[in-house]
Amino acid sequence: MIYAVGIGPGDPDMLPHKTVLLLKEADVISGFETVLNLAEKHFNPNATRVSMGYKDQSEKLEQVGKYSREGKVCVVCFMGDVNFSGYEYLERIHNDCHEPDPIIIPGISSAQMAASKTLTAFETSEFLTFHKRGDISKDKEFLVSALKLGKAAIVIPLPWDFMPAEISRYLIEQGIPPKTEVNVFEHLTWPEEKSYSRT
C-alpha cells in the first residue's frame, strides 16, 4: 500500500494528525531529501528511508513500489498539498511504483497560508501554479485575464524561470497597471519566513 501525503509548507507541527500517525507507523518513507528533512521528527525510527532527487526519482520510486508489493506500508511525501501542485509527481507513483490507486492525504499548501495572511478568499480569487513541467503560456494568459476581471490571484511561481520579478514584468507588459498591489511570501511557516508588499 502506498500513501501520497502532503507534509505542508515547512513547519513540521502543521501536518495533519492522520499524516503524523501514518509516518510514525510506516515501514517505508520516501520523497525528495529536502521534503523528508522537514517532517523527519515524525518518522518511525525503524522505517526504511528512500531519498530521491530529480535524476533518480524513477529508480527510487520503483524501489518503493517493490516494497509495497511485498506488503509494506509506504509513504511518499509531497511538499505542501498533493492537490495544489503535485499531480506530476503523483503520475510517477502510478507509472514508476506501478500503483494505480495510492491513497492521498492532503496537507496544507503554501497557497493556503498566503491566502490566510492576506485575507484572500479562494471563492473570490483565482489560484494558479506555474510550478510544473511543460508550457505555461496558457496559464500566463489565464492570470492576465483574471486580473483584468478584477480578481485577486494566488500564484505559485516556477523556480527559477518565472519568479515574482519575472511575473511582475510580464503582467505590466500585458497591460496590468503597475500600481497593482502584490504580496510576495518566501519560506512560509519556516523560521526564516519573509514577506514583501509592493505595487
Where are these regions (language model features)?
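Short gly/pro/ser/thr-enriched loop/turn and capping motifs at secondary-structure boundaries
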Residues: L36-L38, Q57, S109-M113, R133-I136, ...
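Short amphipathic alpha-helix with an adjacent loop that forms part of the alpha/beta core around
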Residues: L61-Y67, D139-K148
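A contiguous loop/helix-start segment that scaffolds small-molecule binding in enzyme catalytic cores
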Residues: I2-A4, K72-C74, V82, L147-T199
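Class I S-adenosyl-L-methionine
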Residues: M1-I105, M113, A153
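Short hydrophobic/aromatic-enriched beta-strand-loop microsegments
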Residues: A47-Y54, D101-I103, F122-T129, P177-V182
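Solvent-exposed alpha-helices and their adjacent loops that cap or buttress functional pockets
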Residues: L21-L22, C97, T118-A121, V144-G150, ...
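Glycine-rich, charge-decorated loop segments at or immediately adjacent to ligand/cofactor-binding or catalytic sites
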Residues: A111-T120, P191-S197
